Amino acid sequence: MELIEKHVSFGGWQNMYRHYSQSLKCEMNVGVYLPPKAANEKLPVLYWLSGLTCNEQNFITKSGMQRYAAEHNIIVVAPDTSPRGSHVADADRYDLGQGAGFYLNATQAPWNEHYKMYDYIRNELPDLVMHHFPATAKKSISGHSMGGLGALVLALRNPDEYVSVSAFSPIVSPSQVPWGQQAFAAYLAENKDAWLDYDPVSLISQGQRVAEIMVDQGLSDDFYAEQLRTPNLEKICQEMNIKTLIRYHEGYDHSYYFVSSFIGEHIAYHANKLNMR
């Protein structure tokens, strides 16, 4: 991995790296925050997945997470949201193509050549992190919007690999809302069974489980009713007896003003779970 940026932050280092991804067949950037204690010992890792139109910079520059990661001794890894490059398929819209990888493995041309974000996040990136950084094998996952969807899917499908999962404003029923339906139709065609493999509510209804799910949702979020549908997740978790910490916040929208208001609590939540394991 090539170091391309380095900034001291809260006694640790907010670094940016570039590497060639075998899964995605392109160069990828990834942000890695190393707390002060990483200079002398191995630490657990929190993976953060960002939302539509974002790249690896949004979370590390807007959330203020470095303060809390330093306090709780957690390495934070923030990858990009899709493969990138002039040779990578794209679309003339914000919710498909580059910046909108949906953390799945595409099966349809032209997307299937590069869009293997599920494999990248689950397998390739953790292997790189373990090889290049002072990381323990313990890891948790979180994300925002499309990234919250990705975090929930990865945790539900791989419950033994992630100690804990949380999300801000996640797309919980993508197979039932425009964002998910449009992306799934392009990436996965009309194979509705494949769609359900990337739908948190469907996965839970099929019996996939995690110990607990933490979600924060703003009630002034313009996408809440049409695209996100957090109550669907709350309902299925109640039916399947999955413990949840789902909080609704008056006045908060879909932006990083919302994420930055509660990211400290999410990092503390993951730190507690990681230290218990």
From Swiss-Prot:
Keywords: Hydrolase, Serine esterase. Inhibited by the sulfhydryl inhibitors (N-ethylmaleimide, iodoacetate, ZnCl(2) and CuCl(2)). One of its GO terms (cellular component) is cytosol. One of its GO terms (molecular function) is S-formylglutathione hydrolase activity. It comes from the Bacteria. GO terms for biological process: formaldehyde catabolic process; formaldehyde metabolic process. It catalyses: S-formylglutathione + H2O = formate + glutathione + H(+). Its EC number is 3.1.2.12. It is an enzyme of class 3 (hydrolase). Induction: Induced by formaldehyde and repressed by FrmR. The active site is at S145, D221, H254. The keyword Hydrolase applies. Serine hydrolase involved in the detoxification of formaldehyde. Hydrolyzes S-formylglutathione to glutathione and formate. Also shows esterase activity against two pNP-esters (pNP-acetate and pNP-propionate), alpha-naphthyl acetate and lactoylglutathione. Belongs to the esterase D family. This is S-formylglutathione hydrolase FrmB. It comes from Escherichia coli (strain K12). The gene is frmB.
